[in-house]
């Protein structure tokens, strides 16, 4: 299995739905023996330029380990979800588990809570 990093930009009006989206995508990944190593909810942030006449978006970062088949399925889900403004899937060489610079500027308690959540999801397998 390969390691991937996914960044999602969700429509700001759908910010309340982000946790359900993450849960849905997490089950797709974990049901196919994939593992989520890092999950960060960066919250609503200002865009550097308007996308679809929007100036803000809700950002989510996911680092995971999964097969190509799972990534193809996940890519299809991301493409056809109207709430997702943009998504980027990158293949990375190594597992990344430490907090990103975007989250380091926020409260460290939030980071540990998110990491605990992803560890609980992975331990359920």
Swiss-Prot record:
Keyword Ribonucleoprotein belongs to the record: yes
Presence of keyword Coiled coil: no
Keywords in alphabetical order: Ribonucleoprotein, Ribosomal protein, RNA-binding, rRNA-binding
Function of the protein: Binds together with bS18 to 16S ribosomal RNA.
A Pfam family: Ribosomal_S6
Cellular component aspect of the GO annotation: cytosolic small ribosomal subunit
NCBIfam families according to UniProt: S6
Matches recorded under HAMAP family: Ribosomal_bS6
Protein name: Small ribosomal subunit protein bS6
SUPFAM superfamilies: Ribosomal protein S6
Taxonomic lineage: Bacteria, Pseudomonadati, Pseudomonadota, Gammaproteobacteria, Candidatus Palibaumannia
One Gene Ontology MF term: structural constituent of ribosome
């Amino acid at each position: 299995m390969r390691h991937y990093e996914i960044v999602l930009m969700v429509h700001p009006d759908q910010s309340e739905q982000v946790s359900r989206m993450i849960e849905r995508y997490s089950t797709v990944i974990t049901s196919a023996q994939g593992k989520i190593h890092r999950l960060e909810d960066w919250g609503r942030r200002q865009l550097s330029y308007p996308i679809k006449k929007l100036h803000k978006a809700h950002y989510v970062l996911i680092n995971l380990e999964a097969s190509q088949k799972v990534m193809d399925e996940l890519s299809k889900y991301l493409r056809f979800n109207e709430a997702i403004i943009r998504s980027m899937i990158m293949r990375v060489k190594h597992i990344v588990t430490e907090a990103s610079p975007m989250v380091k500027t926020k409260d460290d308690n939030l980071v540990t809570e998110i990491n605990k959540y992803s560890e609980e999801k992975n331990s359920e397998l």
